[in-house]
Amino acid sequence: MVSGSIALNIYGIPRMTRDIDIVIELSENRIDEFINLFPNSYFDKNVIKNEIKRQGMFNIIDHSTGFKIDFMIRKDSEYFTFAFQRRSRIKELDTELWVINLDDLIIAKIIWIQQSQSEKQMSDIENLLLNPEKNIDYIKTWCSKLNLQTFNLLDNE
């Protein structure tokens, strides 16, 4: 499931990026199958195993272009499982992709700002909230369930 800056672009917020964030479901018994999807790339199987266990992330970099793909292991919780199930299949530039749902992208950004309230992240959230397709009740419900500080971003919604 595509997330991050690419998802922002899909939802109408232009952002230049040299990477792509992809949330994946991956188990240890499917690592070889995953690696075979990228025959020209190198992966350290032990790193992938460790990241699966800690529900972290790993990446590949195309050294000729510097383009990077960050693979984030879907976290095993009620919210992240539900958000992954809510992803949307879209067609973008003649390619079909699974992309994070708008509401879950907003929540992902709110989760991100719990650590650091960067102006860029705050601005992204404000701009995403302008989208009339959002489901503000869903967003507020999950922010409350996850005990997230919203920094007054949802106050006018």
PLM features: what roles do these ranges have?
Residues M1-E157:
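Compositionally biased terminal segments of proteins
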